[in-house]
């Protein structure tokens, strides 16, 4: 400690911590190969991960107000727990954001010596035939959907035209109206007041 109550930095202490390794390496040393494989499969299958996290969704537990102030806590507590990073999140949005975050991916790569995202390929490496096939299928699906939509619109328009024609045909025609009243659009020149 310095004279002003501040902590002084000991470079040797932090160098020793850096040489000893990170938390993920100690996690790797404490787990058996079976547990390590289970942990790996847990974080590579997102559907299974979310289903497991949501199993306690409707359970209610009381928490202190001090716990709900921050978005995550170190260690396993009530909420959504990340085994790799040893963090607990209060809601799914923060949890999923953490799973997609670079820090989580780096810890996963350090622990398992392989990338978290397995399906990575450069779009320049896609064969021309595969690209053309996907493109033609996409265009074909689009045309089919649009043709169905236009057919349904035409059918609706024809139905409304038929209904209008029926209404016009069922309207009684008044032969006794004068040409002037027909032209003006009313039946007679009488007043509506009584």
From Swiss-Prot:
PROSITE patterns linked: ZINC_FINGER_C2H2_1
Pfam families: zf-met (PF12874)
Cellular compartments annotated: Nucleus
GO CC terms, sorted: nucleus; spliceosomal complex; U4/U6 x U5 tri-snRNP complex
Keywords: Metal-binding, mRNA processing, mRNA splicing, Nucleus, Repeat, Ribonucleoprotein, Spliceosome, Zinc, Zinc-finger
Function, in words: Participates in pre-mRNA splicing. Part of the U4/U5/U6 tri-snRNP complex, one of the building blocks of the spliceosome.
Full protein name: 23 kDa U4/U6.U5 small nuclear ribonucleoprotein component
Organism: Saccharomyces cerevisiae (strain ATCC 204508 / S288c)
Gene encoding the protein: SNU23
